[in-house]
Amino acid sequence: MKTLTRKISRTVITLLLVIIAIVLIFRIWVFYTESPWTRDAKFTADVVAIAPDVSGLISEVRVRDNQLVQKDQVLFTIDPPRYQKALDEAQADVAYYQAVMGEKRREAARRNQLGVSAMSREAIEQANNDYQTTEHQLAKAVASRDLAQLDLERTVVKAPSAGWVTNLNVYTGEFITRGSTSVALVKQNSFYVLAYLEETKLEGIRPGYRVEITPLGSNQVLRGSVDSIAAGVTNSSSTVDSKGMATIDSNLEWVRLAQRVPVRIHLDSQPGNQYPSGTTATVVVTGAQDRKDNDMPPLMKLIHRLREFG
């Protein structure tokens, strides 16, 4: 009798364990498939590559690497005395041609007033032509002066927006050329997440759907919403040869790797530079509504945590 009872107990326990295992496997399967998710997501921000519009020696650097700067804050200056001299020269040219043009205008007016009775028509036309030529020369000098003024203003390189200076590689006394990138500015309040989700999961994603973002190595869960889905990605399986013929890569019919599509995610609140642009995160699309952590069983919370690594 005891042997029979023991066998029945073992059988019942085994069945219970099997049922529990089936339930756990089912719950895990549902959890992994009900919500589109990926561990291939990156924090991203708008980055401005700052390059000077003039060439010259760097006179002063007023910021340090990774410093938070405000809009129009001076980053560095480039040889202002040289460009001030160029502006002074251009202003002198303008003054000279203004004086010459005044003289030519009076001469042309005098000859036009005297008329052909006092001098030849050629002399009158020559005076008018000289006046027009000087007028054009003055306009050119004014344009050169305005350009010199603009160059002088551009010797002071300012931040186009608030943000963090990064990869600062300019130093006082260094010669810098026009158009060469000198520093990158990560714009403040421009952070978002780019999640690369498999094409098989796109059916469960719509703009406006709520998203949970877990930075790699962090217990903090950020929230956001789907902003947009990329309209296309590069077809890596097809290229064109030198003769314009299509070249298609060989593929195994029973092995299909899902293409990853970028999905842009808007963050509800900006994290500042706590999670720098380029760092990794796990993203879960929860649907039209946020998922409440208080209603989630402990087991599901554990699975949610393990999903970051698994």
Swiss-Prot record:
It comes from Erwinia tasmaniensis (strain DSM 17950 / CFBP 7177 / CIP 109463 / NCPPB 4357 / Et1/99). Coiled coil: none annotated. InterPro entries: CusB-like_dom_1, CusB_D23, MFP_Efflux_Pump, PHBA_efflux_pump_AaeA, RND_pump_MFP. This is p-hydroxybenzoic acid efflux pump subunit AaeA. Forms an efflux pump with AaeB. The gene is aaeA. It comes from the Bacteria. The lineage of its organism: Bacteria, Pseudomonadati, Pseudomonadota, Gammaproteobacteria, Enterobacterales. It is a single-pass membrane protein. Belongs to the membrane fusion protein (MFP) (TC 8.A.1) family. Its main location: membrane. PANTHER family: P-HYDROXYBENZOIC ACID EFFLUX PUMP SUBUNIT AAEA, P-HYDROXYBENZOIC ACID EFFLUX PUMP SUBUNIT AAEA-RELATED. One of its GO terms (cellular component) is plasma membrane. One of its GO terms (molecular function) is transmembrane transporter activity. SUPFAM superfamilies: HlyD-like secretion proteins. It is found in: Cell inner membrane. Keywords: Cell inner membrane, Cell membrane, Membrane, Transmembrane, Transmembrane helix, Transport.
